[in-house]
């Protein structure tokens, strides 16, 4: 099996969906391995724009399988809404497969997410309140309900009653709140499970069959390395592992199955939610990037925080995710700026450091050390090769590659498919 993993190298929203869709043309199977409907990606297909949250990008290709792996947490009601929306626009979803081992998000997870953020007050993490974290907590506590359980009426009824009793005790003690009732959950979610039943299967077997048949598998990451619960800006992170290594756990394939890891980044940096962001901009350059780049969350609609490109972040991501190739998006957004900056290192308490600190208090004290390069004013949205880029834009990309220690295989100068440029064959 030839396989490629696509991961975000920053704090999510790097354009992974677009790159996944671009690479999916040559794949046989496209599989998601982590996260839930807190992730949002925008796809241009057939001249139309689609915003997906749970459904893999491969859904648009009838001859390819789109797989939701066991590492994904699934809100069945939200998933059905997404599938219905695609069907209404003429997109078939018959090629979707959902792992029978995927955890189910239920209304008490959504309630718990809301209560937890309220309890934290000024120390809130800034979650999307989609129930992702609480669902992963239940998984670790071994009380989670999986897709296989949801489909069996007696099993779902028994497990749901047990969990509601437990959640009520927790909610009363911690939040002085009550859990959604059995009657408020059971009928709706059991019916949702029955509607999804034909999609649910052992997806690890599908991927193993693809391996045996020497098919091409594309693993689609969610969020980004800096939101990884182990390797990101903890605790301002997601509740799963977006790093490439989680492909093995989140889909059931072996580690030897991965051929390449494509790290996707923007030509600048963005972040949604709270947490440290060393290169964040609050000036006119930041306003330019946010408005030209349309930096508003796909899932939340919240304005994203934006900043200069941070090579300290990228080097960290390269190391912990084994990135072999770089895909740089949104280069066109920087057009018109007099100068562009790259963070090459941090200053921490008067000393220069080149590695990303694990300690949050240290990270907050870090000051970015910038290298300044001349900008460009030429319209680059029609460029199809590095040689066609203005010299200053080309020098900017080459400097990023040099600082991060990864060669560039893809660059993008706009949102459309034809504005994504492949510099070398990846499959």
From Swiss-Prot:
Signal peptide: none annotated. Binds 1 Mg(2+) ion per subunit. It is an enzyme of class 6 (ligase). Its cofactor is Mg(2+). GO terms for molecular function: adenylosuccinate synthase activity; GTP binding; magnesium ion binding. This is Adenylosuccinate synthetase. The gene is purA. GO terms for cellular component: cytoplasm. PANTHER family: ADENYLOSUCCINATE SYNTHETASE (PTHR11846:SF0). Mg(2+) binds at residues 13, 40. Its main location: cytoplasm.
